[in-house]
Amino acid sequence: MSATLALTEQLIARASVTPDDQHCQQLMIERLAALGFECETIASHGVTNFWAVKRGTAGRAGKLLAFAGHTDVVPTGPLEQWRSPPFVPTHRDGKLYGRGAADMKTSLAGFVVAAEEFVAAHPQHRGSIGFLITSDEEGPATDGTVKVVEALAARGERLDYCIVGEPTSTATLGDVVKNGRRGSMSGELVVKGVQGHIAYPHLAKNPIHLLAPALAELAAEQWDEGNEYFPPTTWQVSNLRAGTGATNVIPGHADLLFNFRFSTASTVEGLQARVHAILDRHGLDYTLNWSVSGLPFLTPRGELSNALDAAIRAETGVSPELSTTGGTSDGRFIARICPQVIEFGPPNASIHKIDEHIDVRFVDPLKNVYRRVLEQLIA
């Protein structure tokens, strides 16, 4: 059994449902410390994080490439639906089954073994290697990567390159890498009316009727046209609530929850201003609370994307596509202290599902891609 596969199995066997790390990080830290990494645990409100760095011969003057990822996994769902226990690594039909196999314990194992092989082959490597690992990516993500980034920023630590081990591939290993993600912003809108008897509408104000024209305009609005890297910004309603449950009462308020997924072609302030303008134009009496869970980030083609492209081609023969689709990731936090952030990992078809798995034939090639990038950028 390869070193990467063995470590993957060890990590899967630890039931690290978010935010409980179950000592996955300690297992990684022990391996990294043996290589000479300086390892620091940064805990916050029950979340376990660590930052590890091995300086190269150039010290802080050299480039720093960090691997970022998460040890936490999503809950298993109904255990009886799994063909094998989710935290017992199981081989079947050339695949390794277990919660976290694809998202993202194989990537974590690949990071560690790639670093081990690289340091053994290049003991005098010029650049530095970092690890930024959290147990709070699948949860609220309020005490995980963002806390490590804040700590690193406070001490003036800057990363030059970062590979996030998210499962970005689709049909085969290496066909898709993510060089950015859209931002996410939600709004909680309450439109005020006047409750009353449904037979006497002149004595009430129906907030649903008042909201409807504005809602139609918001849904039809073209927020931007996107750009070379991002599709157009989208606005979607997630929840609409009103009424008492009775059929003869006009409600006193209507509550609307909505979300923007926005590109670098729009700004938080610009989108908020346009929403308020539409609501004001329709004369609504309302309150609106905003929450921004992530800003968009983008890594244009450059040293990291070129190195990853070359490594994937050499290892798999696949020509990767750069993409910014999908939801948010911890890359949005890391981009604050790192100009080049790219996500790359195994196929994602089974992530978060019953019988999550990875094709065993992809395990070592994934590790080899990570090692090749180290060799190209910091050897």
UniProtKB/Swiss-Prot annotation:
Active site (UniProt) = 72, 137 (proton acceptor)
Q: Where are the transmembrane segments?
A: none
Any one GO molecular function term: zinc ion binding
Q: Name one Pfam family in it.
A: Peptidase_M20
Pathway membership, UniProt: Amino-acid biosynthesis; L-lysine biosynthesis via DAP pathway; LL-2,6-diaminopimelate from (S)-tetrahydrodipicolinate (succinylase route): step 3/3
Gene Ontology terms: biological process: diaminopimelate biosynthetic process; L-arginine biosynthetic process; lysine biosynthetic process via diaminopimelate
* UniProt keyword annotations, A-Z: Amino-acid biosynthesis, Cobalt, Diaminopimelate biosynthesis, Hydrolase, Lysine biosynthesis, Metal-binding, Zinc
Q: How is the cofactor bound?
A: Binds 2 Zn(2+) or Co(2+) ions per subunit.
Query: Reaction(s) catalyzed by this protein?
Result: N-succinyl-(2S,6S)-2,6-diaminopimelate + H2O = (2S,6S)-2,6-diaminopimelate + succinate
Q: Which InterPro entries match?
A: ArgE/DapE_CS, Bact_exopeptidase_dim_dom, DapE_proteobac, Peptidase_M20, Peptidase_M20_dimer, Peptidase_M20A
Q: Which Gene3D superfamilies match?
A: Zn peptidases
This entry's Enzyme Commission designation comes to 3.5.1.18
Task: Identify the residues that bind Zn(2+) 1.
Answer: 70, 103, 166
- What family does the database annotate? Belongs to the peptidase M20A family. DapE subfamily.
Subunit details? Homodimer.
Known role? Catalyzes the hydrolysis of N-succinyl-L,L-diaminopimelic acid (SDAP), forming succinate and LL-2,6-diaminopimelate (DAP), an intermediate involved in the bacterial biosynthesis of lysine and meso-diaminopimelic acid, an essential component of bacterial cell walls.
Protein name, as recorded: Succinyl-diaminopimelate desuccinylase
Q: Which organism is it from?
A: Burkholderia mallei (strain ATCC 23344)
